[in-house]
Amino acid sequence: MKLELRISNYDLLDEYLKRDIDIIGFGDEYCEWAIFNVPKLKEVVKKTLEAGKTVRVVTSFTTKECFENTVRLIEELGLISKEIEFVVNDYGVLQYLHKKEIDNKIIIGQMLNHSLEEYLWSDEIIKQESEKVKNSWLYSNFGNESVIEYFKEKYHIAGGIFNLLPFGKKVQKLCRELIGK
């Protein structure tokens, strides 16, 4: 198992690089403004790669206002190294990267791979439903082989980020078998 540390305070990078961590992540699933200091991010990405760590850049759900900045950031960082992994949480960004034929590893993020199971009130929402409906609502939108195969073939996804709740664990196992991660 690999250990990832997601950071937002770049000033502490030297300290983080000393730790026994495999992956250093930059960005945030929920805040599209968290990674737009491009010159600083380029600097910390290069330093992280030089330290022998895997770099994972996390993009959020992207509004129209931030779309251009997000894809420009990915393109610029992709020029630094093809080893940088990008966690994508927006279908529009995923489609754009596919059309641009970006060679970096693309990982489906939590915002694209979510389920009702993650919400605290999910039991209350589905308590009157049949078991079949409950299972459908609780299962991730990446919870079947055909969806995983489609994204693997069309978008060349290299993996996904999953919750560790019961249904999330099932989807994680299925993806591991189909994607090999």
Where are each of the predicted segments found?
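Active-site catalytic motif of lipid deacylating hydrolases and related acyltransferases
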Residues: 48
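Active-site pocket-lining/capping segments in soluble small-molecule metabolic enzymes
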Residues: 1-44, 53, 58-181
